[in-house]
Amino acid sequence: MGITIVLGSQWGDEGKGKITDMLSQQATLCCRAAGGHNAGHTIVHENITYDFHILPSGLVSPSCVNLIGAGTVVHVPSFFKELASLEEKGLKDAGKRIFISDRAHVCFDLHSIVDGLEEAKLGGRKVGTTGKGIGPCYSDKAARRGVRIGEVLDEAVFERKLRSLHAGYTARFGELQYDVEEEIGRFKDYRKRLVPYIVDQLAFFKQYKDSPNTLVEGANALMLDLDHGTYPYVTSSSTGLGGAVQALSLNPTSITSVIGVVKAYTTRVGSGPFPSEQLNEYGDKLQSVGREFGVTTGRRRRCGWFDLVLCRYSQAINHYTALNLTKLDILDDFDEIKVAVAYVLPDGTRLTDTYPADPEVLEKVKVEYVTLPGWKSNTMGVKKYEDLPANARAYIEYIERELGGVPIKWIGTGPARDHMICRE
């Protein structure tokens, strides 16, 4: 089994869906390793737009079987709603090609309510979550009181554990706008509907042990990783290479490539440090031209210049074998383009390839930039590297050199499925 892993290299929203969609055309399996319906990406295929949240985007490929792995959290109503949307858009057999590990955890509406209450308590220091209940669900998992997907099938166990969860949160927060008996009633229907989707993950993988190509689709990104991201302004799962290996029980020796997806500039949704953020006309232009609004929340994304310090750190953690640089065309109309090359700490220390763990330190760094000339010409839809303007190629090759020679193998030049340059 050859395994390709696609990972976000920044703070998410890099455009992982398109490269995953492209690679899934040759894949037998496509797997989600972590996260829940807080993730979001869009794929345009044959003029139809598909929005993915919890489902793997390999479902667009008719020959690809898909798995939601043990490291994920699944909001069951959203699972069925998203699946129905895909089927309505023409993917009629999607329900026959999607499976869920029995070890994945259930994200309840209760978790979403608690998410909002916890954010409100933080006040001005709120994390800026999606409000989907992901954090509280992973907290319950870590505290060993969560409900696994496989346990939904045992009615008595399921009801006992959900009532216990509700009692615990009621003791903490008081009366909640949540009817646990109503939720239990809804799951009587979901229980029957879930049966054909739930699998033992190891047994499932054994069926595909001779698969020539397995694709792992990362959710979120390295800088949102619970351990390695800008904690506490992170998600609640392990979003890097190690998390994918752990969640899917992958054999590390079978991993043939690790693809880092990185925007040609930088964006972030929600709170937290963002050293290269541009709170000026440049940031506004990136946001406007790039149509930077979250797929899941609709929130306006914060925008800034490409950050080499961040990406060197990301490379050191995830060990990318190749990169996919996305949304190059958004930079088409800039006279000059800046790249962050170093952080200077308040004490004068200059950092180029390490990333401070303390978010308050990150808020105080001064950023050093190099300025590169723009290309002032249209790159949207360009499919050959040699057809790019010289300054666009210079920008790509500068980033490539500064990241230690990790090849930028794919370059996104627009939203459509075929707006991609492949450099062999």
Curated annotation (Swiss-Prot):
Concerning CDD domains, the annotation shows:
AdSS
Main localisation: cytoplasm
Q: In which pathway does it act?
A: Purine metabolism; AMP biosynthesis via de novo pathway; AMP from IMP: step 1/2
Q: Which reaction does it catalyse?
A: IMP + L-aspartate + GTP = N(6)-(1,2-dicarboxyethyl)-AMP + GDP + phosphate + 2 H(+)
Which locations, inside or outside the cell, does it occupy? Cytoplasm
Note how many cofactor molecules are bound and how. Answer: Binds 1 Mg(2+) ion per subunit.
- EC number assigned by the record: 6.3.4.4
Q: Where on this chain does GTP bind?
A: 12-18, 40-42, 301, 327-329, 412-414
Q: Which family does it belong to?
A: Belongs to the adenylosuccinate synthetase family.
Q: What is this protein called?
A: Adenylosuccinate synthetase
